[in-house]
Amino acid sequence: MNTIYTGTPDSRLYKEVLGKTIGELLEADEKVVYLDADLMSCIGTAKLPDKFDRAVNCGIAESNMIGIAGGVAAAGMKPICHSFGPFASRRCFDQLFLSAGYGKNDITVIGSDPGITAAFNGGTHMPFEDVALYRTIPTAIICDTTDVTMLRAFLFMAKDMPGVKFVRVGRKTSYPVYPEDTEFKVGKGFVLRDGTDATIIASGIMVHEALQAAIKLEAEGISVAVIDPFTIKPLDTELVLEYAKKTGAIVTAENHNKIGGLYSAVKETLDGEAKTGYVAIEDEFGEVGPQDYLRTRFDLTDDHIVRVVKETIAKKG
């Protein structure tokens, strides 16, 4: 596809776009209800309760918030919930699984500051396992947003989709990739760059790193495709298998533990169809620090992707 990627950060902050988008959803659809776990000031939604009685601060009580969302959904409304990533996943998982998933109540959950983007909030606030948890909820839909265009598109889609929908989103800047008129479809990925020697499948903040890695590899004469899956669940398995056969080497890149996330989903799909490698968090906890430090600390860099791609290509013999 034709992208607008230049490697230049967006002037818009995620939280500004998120607040504006939720306001638009509340304005456009009287069935939309916005629930927040006392973090409205962190995500650009602090003024919404002044305008909408359907914007509610549930306090620091995430499990209760998801229970409320299940009840609101059962009454025919369209709840959108927000908390920081770990509290929108592991803290309220039983309610997500039962009140939403098992109860067939349609809710959308926003988990902000996923993975290393939690930065100075530290390891307690740094979810490396949220995608893995949501993947175990039958029929759940998971999106790790690449830029604000994808974020807006997913939220407008999600409010009318059945089941549990989980979206990972940062609060600060992103790197624009998608034109505003991009047509997003659940379960359909995008080929951002084509290539023949290897394929990088990347999600969220790692899409930028993957594209930078592909540029560096191209300068060395190595042709690398870059795929953004859009939804990690359901995964575009046809596209994954197509590029496994085309390039014979697949490397995943994610801001998440290697266990249970994008790498796991891709490996489950491939079943030996290609040589594989991964760039992800190893089996460890998060820690405090600026994003640049954490990116290097956990090997979530374009240079590390370059190394893993070369190693994976070498496995082809």
Residue ranges, per PLM feature:
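Thiamine diphosphate
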Residues: 1-162, 166-168, 173, 183, ...
